[in-house]
Design a protein with these regions (language model features):
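Loop/turn positions that initiate beta-strands
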Residues: 5-7
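C-terminal terminal-subdomain/extension
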Residues: 57-129
Length: 129
């Protein structure tokens, strides 16, 4: 069952690309059956440094990485479950609570977070301290 803190290893978007680690920021939204997700990339020049992750923050992370808020999205639970059942996505270890909290806090700080994602998060963040 998908829930806040889960991580998935899957490609970005509909067109096949190299898979990345994705983090679910919330439980499925009631009435919509969707979750808010962000992906984590290897640190590179000019990357969004609002929220950086390092070795120890998650077992999958082997070098400095960043949360790519520009690719954050609201995704249907059905779509993610379909990807999991057809092996286009794989579960990875859940995020530590303190890491999940940091990623959530930085979502509204990052200048790269899409406006629609900001608005969605503002509506649901009251459920997550």
């Amino acid at each position: 069952m998908l829930k806040a803190g889960n991580t998935l290893y899957m490609p970005i978007g509909e067109i096949y690309r190299k898979p990345h680690l994705w983090a679910l920021l919330c439980d499925p939204i009631k009435g919509e059956d969707k979750v808010l997700i962000v992906n984590i990339n290897t640190m590179r020049k000019n990357a969004d440094s609002t929220c950086t992750l390092n070795v120890g923050d998650h077992p999958f992370i082997r070098h400095e990485s960043f949360v790519n808020y520009a690719n954050s999205a609201l995704v249907s639970v059905e779509k993610l479950e379909d990807s999991l059942s057809t092996w286009r996505a794989e579960y990875r270890e859940a995020l530590k609570e303190k890491v999940l909290k940091r990623i959530r806090q930085c979502l509204l700080v990052s200048p790269h977070t899409p406006f629609d994602v900001r608005n969605i998060w503002l509506k649901i963040m009251k459920n997550y301290d």
